[in-house]
């Protein structure tokens, strides 16, 4: 076992018991809590709802904050690979604290220079410069503090807490602005609380300690020498790795859409919700609430959700809900429906955000991770900068009148991204679109509901005739195999009564399953099995033919699997399944939660049976050898889990 693997085993199973992760998690949440406090105050200082172009003001502020991510993203990524990520984040927090704390003096001074609306944009640009260094350092540090199988949950937890902070920040920021307008407090309290949040974040980050259990001490870390060569390597890595490039492009589309939706919220709030600053914070907070909810759902599902399925659902839902928001604005459908639309946009946006981070963290080596995140930040933030720049830089009169058109184009852009993602995920896939999509759903079911965990690699070859033989424990066994053998469709031998059922039969015919009448098998079953193997298919079979409760003796293997193996010469791959809960009805077993363990083995050696084609005992003996190989896998699984 490698040093990195041994270190990973020492990390806690529960993320909340990992002190380093909890400190990073809490620091990000607290800093997010202060983010919109200053933004709402600056928006009011620039004129806010009293202007007919509130969309332009919001877009300009968003543009100024994210522009440094585009300009400095690759450099910040190089910095995260070259210098301490922890101290980079602490320094970024303390500098942003200084910037926010000085706003009561700097904003009036900038207005005195006759900078117009840029007087509220420049302080945000200054804060964005150091946020651009904070982001790749944080994202690159996460995998060094946790196990690989915790990436989805960790990123979802970080996203959820960050968006909860954003919800409270937007609501509190708007409420404080309303109080300041009423004369109860001074507007400067928005800036002071924002500065305080960065101080608290820095204190928490300072508590992160690199001990023996931290993977960052044991994973070889190549120091990125120089500046320009490492920067070029970051771009080259993204260009060479198609999966990383694709997910960054999808993140780019999401952030362009997010920039437009965030920019139009003040106009929507004024026209539909009455024009209060607290309303603006609350309804903008609904997007953040949706992001938090989506992240919480991903935390619950964890790695069970296949990335392609998650991305497709996020793009489809995002596009449709943006159009629904457009319809709410045009048809005056009211506050409740509009709020639901904003919330659901956030829910589906979480799917994109978390998947972007997880894929980069999972596939990119630690020594290059910061630079790749820098490229990702540059690309995704370029999208939001371009989108908001087109709205905020030109002085478009009565821009708010064009909000329905902006939302319509945004929804169409997300659906076009959906079509692109579908084409890329389907590229080179030998299965029909229906089979592929159902397979993704089966993988989600097996991973989440059955809590399946595969021990070792799947040994089923990608091509050629194969008999996949497994012990039979429950009605979910076929779905468990389909969920863990992700590169081949397994065609199972199934009972005729299930094959003839309306919905189940349709699914079985798609997978080319072979029906058999248990009372009267007939020759058609054998002929269809031989034909499938002759065509190079993968035949799934349960040698025992049935399953029984755990307290009853395990059935012995029947001769059918041995006869097929000897007659066709197909490779036989053993598979052992454990951890299912017994139910007499296969239908009932689908709704019971399991904790399944699956192990695939090496091909079964049946060379001892060559030349015994006429021996009537050979099929039964071969079946016994196959069943023995399956049981041996069970002993290996029990030993490793002990």
Residue ranges and their predicted role:
Residues 432-434, 462-521:
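Catalytic core of membrane glycerolipid acyltransferases/transacylases, capturing the structured
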Residues 29, 112-133, 252-253, 335-351:
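Hydrophobic core of transmembrane alpha-helices in multi-pass small-molecule transporters
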Residues 434-437, 441, 524-642:
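Non-catalytic C-terminal accessory region of glycerolipid acyltransferases
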Residues 140, 144, 191-223, 304, ...:
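Helix-loop junctions on the cytosolic side of multi-pass membrane transporters
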Residues 57-64, 71, 75, 82, ...:
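C-terminal transmembrane bundle of multi-pass solute transporters/carriers
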């Amino acid at each position: 076992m490698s040093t990195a693997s041994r270190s990973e085993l020492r990390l806690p199973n529960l993320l909340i018991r990992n002190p380093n992760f909890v400190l990073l998690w809490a620091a990000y949440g607290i800093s997010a809590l202060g983010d919109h406090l200053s933004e709402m105050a600056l928006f009011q200082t620039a004129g806010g709802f009293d202007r007919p172009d509130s969309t332009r003001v919001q877009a300009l502020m968003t543009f100024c904050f994210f522009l440094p991510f585009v300009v400095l993203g690759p450099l910040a990524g190089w910095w995260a690979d070259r210098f301490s990520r922890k101290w980079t984040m602490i320094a970024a927090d303390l500098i942003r604290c200084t910037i926010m704390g000085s706003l009561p003096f700097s904003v009036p001074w900038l207005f005195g220079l006759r900078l117009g609306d840029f007087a509220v944009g420049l302080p945000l640009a200054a804060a964005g410069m150091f946020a651009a260094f904070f982001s790749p350092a944080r994202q690159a540090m996460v995998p060094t503090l946790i196990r690989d199988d915790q990436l989805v949950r960790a990123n979802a937890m970080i996203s959820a807490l960050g968006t909860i902070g954003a919800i409270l920040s937007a609501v509190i920021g708007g409420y404080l602005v309303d109080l300041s307008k009423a004369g109860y407090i001074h507007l400067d309290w928005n800036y002071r609380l924002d500065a305080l949040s960065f101080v608290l974040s820095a204190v928490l980050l300072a508590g992160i300690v690199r001990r023996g259990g931290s993977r960052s001490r044991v994973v070889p870390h190549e120091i990125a020498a120089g500046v320009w060569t490492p920067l070029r390597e970051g771009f080259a890595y993204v260009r060479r790795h198609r999966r990383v490039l694709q997910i960054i492009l999808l993140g780019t589309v999401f952030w362009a859409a997010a920039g437009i939706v965030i920019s139009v919220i003040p106009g929507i709030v004024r026209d539909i919700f009455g024009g209060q600053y607290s309303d603006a914070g609350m309804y903008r907070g609904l997007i953040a609430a949706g992001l938090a909810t989506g992240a919480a759902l991903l935390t619950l599902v964890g790695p069970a959700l296949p990335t392609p399925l998650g991305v497709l659902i996020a793009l489809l839902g995002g596009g449709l809900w943006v159009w629904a928001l457009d319809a709410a604005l045009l048809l005056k459908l009211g506050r409740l429906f509009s709020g639901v639309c904003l919330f659901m946009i956030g829910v589906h946006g979480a799917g994109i955000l978390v998947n972007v981070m997880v894929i980069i963290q999972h596939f990119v080596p630690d020594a290059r991770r910061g630079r790749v995140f820098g490229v990702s930040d540059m690309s995704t933030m370029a999208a939001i900068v371009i989108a908001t720049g087109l709205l905020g830089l030109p002085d478009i009169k009565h821009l708010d009148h064009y909000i329905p058109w902006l939302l319509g184009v945004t929804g169409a852009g997300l659906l076009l991204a959906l079509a692109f993602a579908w084409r890329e995920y389907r590229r080179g896939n030998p299965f029909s679109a229906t089979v592929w999509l159902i397979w993704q759903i089966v993988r989600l079911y097996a991973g989440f509901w059955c809590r399946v965990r595969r021990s070792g690699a799947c040994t089923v070859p990608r091509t050629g005739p194969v008999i996949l033989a497994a012990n039979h424990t429950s009605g979910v066994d076929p779905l468990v195999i389909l969920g863990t053998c992700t590169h081949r469709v397994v065609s199972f031998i199934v009972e005729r009564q299930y094959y003839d059922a309306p919905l189940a039969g349709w699914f079985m015919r798609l997978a080319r399953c072979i029906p058999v009448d248990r009372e009267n098998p007939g020759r058609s079953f054998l002929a269809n099995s031989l034909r499938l193997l002759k065509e190079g298919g993968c035949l799934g079979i349960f040698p025992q033919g049935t399953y029984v409760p755990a307290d009853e003796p395990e059935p012995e293997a029947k001769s059918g699997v041995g006869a097929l193996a000897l007659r066709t010469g197909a490779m036989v791959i053993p598979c052992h399944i454990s951890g299912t809960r017994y139910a007499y009805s296969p239908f009932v077993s689908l709704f019971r939660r399991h904790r399944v363990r699956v192990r695939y083995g090496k091909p079964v050696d049946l060379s001892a049976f060559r030349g015994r084609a006429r021996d009537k005992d050979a099929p039964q003996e071969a079946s016994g050898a196959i069943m023995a190989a399956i049981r041996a896998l069970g002993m290996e699984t029990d030993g490793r889990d002990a």
